[in-house]
Curated annotation (Swiss-Prot):
One of its GO terms (biological process) is 'de novo' IMP biosynthetic process. Gene3D superfamilies: ATP-grasp fold, B domain (3.30.470.20), Phosphorylase Kinase, domain 1 (3.30.200.20). The keyword RNA-binding does not apply. InterPro entries: SAICAR_synt/ADE2_N, SAICAR_synt_PurC, SAICAR_synth, SAICAR_synthetase, SAICAR_synthetase_CS. Its EC number is 6.3.2.6. HAMAP family: SAICAR_synth. One of its GO terms (molecular function) is phosphoribosylaminoimidazolesuccinocarboxamide synthase activity. The lineage of its organism: Bacteria, Bacillati, Cyanobacteriota, Cyanophyceae, Gomontiellales. It holds the Pfam family SAICAR_synt. Keywords: ATP-binding, Ligase, Nucleotide-binding, Purine biosynthesis. It comes from Cyanothece sp. (strain PCC 7425 / ATCC 29141). This is Phosphoribosylaminoimidazole-succinocarboxamide synthase.
Amino acid sequence: MHTDEKIYEGKAKVLYPTDDPQVFQVHFKDDATAFNAQKRGAIAGKGRINCTISAHLFQMLAKAGIANHFLSQPAPDQMLVRAVQIIPVEVVVRNIAAGSLCQQTGLPLGTPLKKPLVEFYYKNDDLGDPLLTRERLLLLELATAAEIEQLEALARQINEHLIVFFQQCGITLVDFKLEFGRDQNQHILLADEISPDTCRLWNQSETDPEQRVMDKDRFRRDLGNVESAYEQVMARVLAQPL
């Protein structure tokens, strides 16, 4: 049971304490933002959908040996998680060229990458979440050299599991972002969420570059049918056994 006191409120979630100092309750919101919150709106049912998808994927990854913060889902839009100190770094994994990678490199949209690309972004809205080199991660003391290696290794492992899982759902995992945190013993755990908000997902049964989109790009690019796309992802995810 959480109190009314918030530990933290972000764009998509609110974090509350519980009776156990090592357990937090996360409330997933319907609020939607894009372009570092320059575009704002709401997606009906998004909190429930993203929480449910994340819970299923966290449990799947835990069974595959990926330690994460998920404990339980006491309500459709609520999750109990292990308390972690979030590392202020977004770890982005790219399998296919899209989004900023196309804008910054000139690669055509949809170009398969020969090897998954792992990138680190500073989780800092004031600075616009800039791309960081490993040297800058060390300079800012955001993580140790050993932790950086661990984050990349974990991201690649998670990518392998998610590619297979989404393939079984008839969905192509284009790219996605991850967040990690340190628990009370300084162990690194996968945290935050894995959902259409944080993944770029393409429907394999669609060839049209707009119709195939099943993620927050529908909101970013005003493609419409955002709620139905999220619902479809959830239905396909839940159809896969843990």
